[in-house]
From Swiss-Prot:
Gene3D superfamilies xref list: 1.10.8.50, MutM-like, N-terminal
GO MF entries: 8-oxo-7,8-dihydroguanine DNA N-glycosylase activity; class I DNA-(apurinic or apyrimidinic site) endonuclease activity; damaged DNA binding; zinc ion binding
PROSITE patterns associated with the record: FPG_CAT (PS51068), ZF_FPG_1 (PS01242), ZF_FPG_2 (PS51066)
Cofactor: Zn(2+)
PANTHER family cross-referenced by the UniProt entry: FORMAMIDOPYRIMIDINE-DNA GLYCOSYLASE
Name this polypeptide is given: Formamidopyrimidine-DNA glycosylase
Assembly mode: Monomer.
Taxonomic source organism: Rhodopseudomonas palustris (strain BisB5)
Length: 293
């Protein structure tokens, strides 16, 4: 499933085509996505200007002039592509054959910018939903989410307090969207490797007896910010289904130090160990026992 960097990459790709422009036409080719599209979905979008395009955790949020918000989630295999309204491709643009299969083009927006924005999702685990901006605090998909890891509210003090007393593993705590929003398996593995912290370590060790951040918390917050920033610059990680809006592959997977590198040499200078894999809470965890303590 796309994580924060992949979703942010999509947002950056959609912004020039959507933000500040009117949805001249909205088409739904099938309504049965992960959750059925609302009956008034097309009516509430047609003619509306997208005043802003943001992101919360792994969700895209398009603010509309009407006061509504269009929430979009990519699911497992969802992707957007942006083409000219007549379907022509920009010269030099690469489109993966999967995202070009029109049988999976479920939602299409023709924008006043001249762009056609197409949501393609073979597995149909993605979804879209419209709700009033005034009700955003009560929106079930957003309610209870922790702070954004790239936002000002996220720091070592906040993370230490959120993990104080938690006897769960550090990895499990970081995957809890109530602790920090938008992190997934890939970037948690990478951040823990950069911080030299074991995924098996208890989350409580990020705080001292006064619930103040330990050195572990300081290292980890820095590592989380760094790995997410690097991944966004690289356009995300393309392991299976993720594509940028241009159809191009992200390439951060070529920089993985831990994730999906089982048996390979650890990239920490002077370590000499090898990356290991084990199943933790139903997910593969990749780490180096030699330098992650």
């Amino acid at each position: 499933m796309p994580e924060l960097p992949e979703v942010e990459t999509v947002r950056l790709g959609l912004t020039p085509a959507m933000e500040g422009f009117r949805i001249a036409r909205a088409v739904t080719n099938r309504d049965d996505l992960r959750f059925p599209l609302q009956k008034d979905f097309v009516a509430r979008l047609t003619g509306q200007i997208v005043t802003g395009l943001g992101r919360r955790a792994k969700y895209l949020l398009a603010d509309l002039a009407s006061g509504d918000v269009l929430l979009m989630h990519l699911g497992m295999s969802g992707s957007f592509r942006v083409v000219a309204a007549d379907g022509a491709h920009t010269p030099g643009e690469f489109h993966h054959p999967r995202s070009e299969d029109r049988t999976h083009d479920h939602v299409v927006f023709d924008m006043s910018s001249g762009a056609r924005v197409i949501f393609n999702d073979p597995r149909r685990f993605g979804f879209m939903k419209i709700f009033p901006r005034a009700a955003i605090d009560d929106e079930p998909h957003l309610k209870g989410l922790g702070p954004e890891p790239l936002g000002n509210a996220f720091d070592a003090v906040m993370l230490a307090r959120a993990c104080a007393g938690k006897q769960t593993s550090l990895k499990a705590a970081l995957l809890d969207q109530r602790v920090v929003a938008g992190l997934g398996n890939i970037y948690v593995c990478e951040a823990l490797w950069r911080a030299h912290l074991s995924p098996k370590r208890k989350a409580a060790t990020l705080a001292n007896r006064k619930n103040e951040p330990t050195d572990h918390a300081l290292r980890l917050t820095d590592a989380i910010r760094a790995v997410l920033g690097d991944a966004i610059k690289a356009g995300g990680s393309s392991l299976r289904d993720h594509r940028q809006t241009s159809g191009e592959l992200g390439y951060f997977q070529h920089s993985f130090a831990a994730y999906d590198r089982e048996g390979e040499r650890c990239r920490t200078d002077g370590c000499g160990g090898a990356v290991k894999r084990f199943v933790q809470n139903g997910r593969s965890t990749f780490w180096c026992s030699g330098c992650q303590k």
